[in-house]
């Protein structure tokens, strides 16, 4: 048994390039695992740098210097963010306040509807269980106000951190874009010399991460706008807020779409009732989700589609548990990285001979 393990070890780990790749991966995972909180602004800056690299290169191709191309792209990007912050965010925030205000009425309607179930289906529903659920719901509503106050006070503590990030992140993005080659050369100098295999994996993953980040942003925008227009067509309350939530839900494959469907169905059901308008609105929402999953995602993420849905869900759960939001956001690239490493890893036949 021990001899078999030794043979397996020699086959898989006799190549110096494989050892170098393993060291780089373990070091990278360890740094992110232990210092993810401290590295949050850097991770945001790296994501934005990947996103803005394409327009920067395009401006360079028409004669702009790297410095000027970076400056122009960053100014335009910040301008778009400010426009969204002053136009979209206040409306979505106001709709969120209205939703919280109307939630007790919605829950009361749900409680009244649930109270009729034991009379309609006495064999399936117990009145005592329904009453207990209604009482539990009322008690939660009474404590909701205190929870909102506590969250508000806690959020005040994070305002300083957010203010610092708003200054640091654009500066980091600027220097990551402007001095990209110098920084990559500096990283190469500290890596092991036998890094041919690592370079092969990096070249493949670098392009995939670029496509993934650009694709995710485009998917969020397309799905969010399409959902908003669909909800506006039916005059659904809180349409912009719900559309923003649906847009952000694409960051979490499968799970996000399932979770965000709950408030969409709840709001539509309480506004329209279980009538034709509700089912028409819900059908439009399902069509948008189907087009996203079966048309938009295959076009934007052709490589990721090769991953089995169970692998994607497990990746979201595992990496999300390890690194929170960033683990969820990069679940598909990380799963693709593991797949690329497995495929690129030496099979050991040369070493055996």
From Swiss-Prot:
Q: Which GO terms describe its biological process?
A: transmembrane transport
Annotated compartments: Cell membrane
What are the UniProt keywords, alphabetically? Cell membrane, Membrane, Transmembrane, Transmembrane helix, Transport
Where are the bilayer-spanning segments? 19-39, 72-92, 156-176, 217-237, 240-260, 281-301, 310-330
Among InterPro entries, the record links this protein to:
AI-2E-like
Q: Which Pfam families match?
A: AI-2E_transport
- Classify the main location: membrane
Topological category with respect to the lipid bilayer: Multi-pass membrane protein
GO CC annotation terms, alphabetical: plasma membrane
Taxonomically, the superkingdom here is: Bacteria
Q: Which family does it belong to?
A: Belongs to the autoinducer-2 exporter (AI-2E) (TC 2.A.86) family.
> What is the official name of this protein in its record?
Putative permease PerM
Species of the source = Escherichia coli (strain K12)
């Amino acid at each position: 048994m021990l001899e078999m393990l030794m043979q397996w070890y020699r086959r898989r780990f006799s190549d110096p390039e494989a050892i170098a790749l393993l060291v780089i991966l373990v070091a990278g995972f360890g740094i992110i695992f232990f210092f993810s909180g401290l590295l949050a602004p850097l991770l945001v800056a790296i994501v934005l740098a990947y996103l803005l690299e394409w327009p920067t290169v395009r401006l360079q191709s028409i004669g702009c210097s790297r410095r000027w191309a970076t400056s122009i792209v960053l100014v335009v990007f910040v301008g778009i963010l400010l426009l969204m912050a002053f136009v979209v965010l206040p409306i979505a925030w106001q709709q969120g306040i209205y939703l919280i205000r109307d939630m007790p009425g919605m829950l009361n309607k749900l409680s009244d509807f649930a109270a009729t179930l034991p009379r309609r289906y006495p064999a399936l529903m117990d009145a005592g269980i329904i009453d207990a659920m209604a009482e539990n719901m009322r008690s939660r509503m009474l404590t909701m106000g205190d929870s909102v106050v506590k969250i508000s006070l806690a959020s005040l503590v994070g305002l300083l951190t957010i203010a610092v990030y708003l200054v640091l992140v654009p500066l980091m993005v600027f220097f990551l874009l402007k001095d990209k080659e110098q920084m990559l050369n500096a990283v190469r100098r500290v890596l092991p010399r036998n890094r041919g295999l690592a370079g092969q994996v990096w070249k493949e993953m670098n392009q995939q991460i670029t496509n993934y980040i650009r694709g995710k942003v485009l998917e969020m925008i397309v799905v969010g706008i399409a959902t908003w227009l669909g909800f506006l067509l039916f005059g659904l309350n809180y349409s912009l807020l719900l559309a923003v939530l649906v847009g952000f839900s694409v960051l979490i494959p499968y799970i996000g779409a399932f979770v965000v469907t709950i408030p969409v169905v709840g709001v539509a059901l309480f506004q329209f009732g279980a009538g034709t308008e509700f089912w028409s609105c819900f059908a439009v929402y399902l069509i948008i989700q189907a087009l996203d999953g079966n048309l938009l995602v295959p076009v934007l993420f052709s490589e990721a589609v090769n991953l089995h849905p169970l692998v994607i869900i497990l990746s979201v759960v595992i990496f999300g548990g390890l690194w929170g939001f960033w683990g969820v956001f990069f679940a598909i690239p990380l799963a693709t990285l593991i797949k690329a490493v497995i495929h690129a890893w030496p099979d050991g036949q040369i070493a055996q001979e």
